């Protein structure tokens, strides 16, 4: 037998799902319990009470009905007097029935004559109740829905109990209490100083978000910081909410299952209300039982009594009332689901009241679950929404970040870079720790692979900050921070992971002198938008661009006329149009790297103030235009390295002011004698070519300090090379030298000598005369050092070890 506890479990879901049950689900639950009690009571009465009592056998039948003998006799006399006939009375067997015969008749009449509704009424009530209970709890146990609901309830309880939720709600209450005070203060300021109001209004017009600043005289009630454990727990909840939302918002299976449950309930309600009242009239107290058992008892018809008829009528009527209440609430819930947009849930009201204005609206099953939770208690959705807000998550990340990155840990990251500046390099963090602004000695701040960085007003504490590097990171600058950067920042390096637009705050850095942009999008045609931006960078002197362009952007040539250095790395894409270079008359240094240039652009020859030209990693095969460089009287540095140049034109001798010449990594086989007319040369790089000899005329380069012919095919060095007394760096590695002239000892200023990769067998003793040569700067095989006489080797070793 099914116990009451087991029946209760069928009608009630797990208690953990109570927050997902609206008031009608609770109402259904209690009605279902009462229905179960009705079914159990009716079943118990039917099992314990006598079913049918057949105590009165019918001895006389008249007109196919049971009649009392004298009534039958009176009727017969009337009939005979009218017809004139005398009907004989039927004869019957006169004997009493045994108790076993009565029991037999009871059983036969119960099975054959009692209406089926009266017999199965308790079971029908039980069946209906079980169907109602199953429909109410099916969505809680169906695998596709129960897993999502269980996950949601688990997360919701964690959100409700998290200290971060309490902190966030407290911040909202605190800010709402502070706002009236701020408004009253602002009205007072507006009434007393109209000029300052205009200034504030102009600042508000900038297209950047205002920072959330607290009033100095009011202490925030949420100033307490979460400990590390609580912060990690809140962080885990944020991740769970993200994954849950991504998973649940894709489908609406919970909504559809819940809707189908209610539709089944309404259909069952209509069915019960239709047939139960109709068959209720078949439950009668008296039953006329006509059965063919006359051979056993002597009677054919019996007058029976169904003792449970009246109480079953009462229970059935009460059951109908319960079903009507159940059906009406089911109809209301169906109307609620069809009327409302339950697949969309908006936090608009909450966004207006709280300081988390970025709480997103949700859809599908996620929205439906929140609607159900609102029917139970709207506070659950409010607390849950805290973990949907990116602003809230960023605040938590900031707190966790501050706990992890203390001042001591940040100070240990400070280093001196190659420019002898104090630099802090932060890599792959969740944000910018607040303790960074305590490092007042920092000069360079480098941020790499940090998804969201916000520079608050506290950046003004970095009084020595002059350089900012932002690599593959998103940087948002507050107004007070922007004002500080405008006055102090001199160098800015921006590198984007994907092609992106230049942040608007860059154009407000009026004192910026060097700007390095990698992976940004610059329009090739001038527009009013960029006209308003670039023209404010009046102090910009150096611009580095790394992108794929077909022409030099017009915003650079037209809006930055005072630019002195322009570097363009085109990443191998062909740079077609260069005519607009003529406008940059103040340019002193020009770098066109990886632009797939086949010839030297003629527009370069109009840059009269040009000092340095770098055409590295292009596709230059000939440089016949080199004669035109004589129109650039200030040109002192020419870099044509990493190309496919086969020869140097004789006209190079016209570049009398040339001081540095880079021709490495080409296909040059010989040097023209006119090259040595460039007597001002002090840096000459001819490494990685196909040279076989060096002309004796190199002696005319009396100012030569750096000479590199690494990785060539040179077999002998001219004596004229050793007449370059100012030579400091001599790179002769990976050639075919078999002998080093003793004249090398005359290079008293030599500090760096490379000889490795040749066919030398000994080193000249005269190396001892190179007083400035250090051991770390002598690149030679150890076996050659051992070939020197011992006194010379020891003396040279002693001199070299002083480095």
UniProtKB/Swiss-Prot annotation:
Highest taxon of source: Eukaryota
Regions of this protein lying in the Cytoplasmic compartment: 1-25, 141-261, 329-803
Reaction(s) catalysed (UniProt annotation): chloride(in) = chloride(out); iodide(out) = iodide(in); taurine(out) = taurine(in)
Transmembrane segments: 26-46, 120-140, 262-282, 308-328
SUBUNIT field: Heterohexamer; oligomerizes with other LRRC8 proteins (LRRC8A, LRRC8C, LRRC8D and/or LRRC8E) to form a heterohexamer. In vivo, the subunit composition may depend primarily on expression levels, and heterooligomeric channels containing various proportions of the different LRRC8 proteins may coexist.
UniProt function note: Non-essential component of the volume-regulated anion channel (VRAC, also named VSOAC channel), an anion channel required to maintain a constant cell volume in response to extracellular or intracellular osmotic changes. The VRAC channel conducts iodide better than chloride and can also conduct organic osmolytes like taurine. Channel activity requires LRRC8A plus at least one other family member (LRRC8B, LRRC8C, LRRC8D or LRRC8E); channel characteristics depend on the precise subunit composition.
Protein name: Volume-regulated anion channel subunit LRRC8B
Annotated source species: Mus musculus
Record lineage: Eukaryota, Metazoa, Chordata, Craniata, Vertebrata
Gene for this chain: Lrrc8b
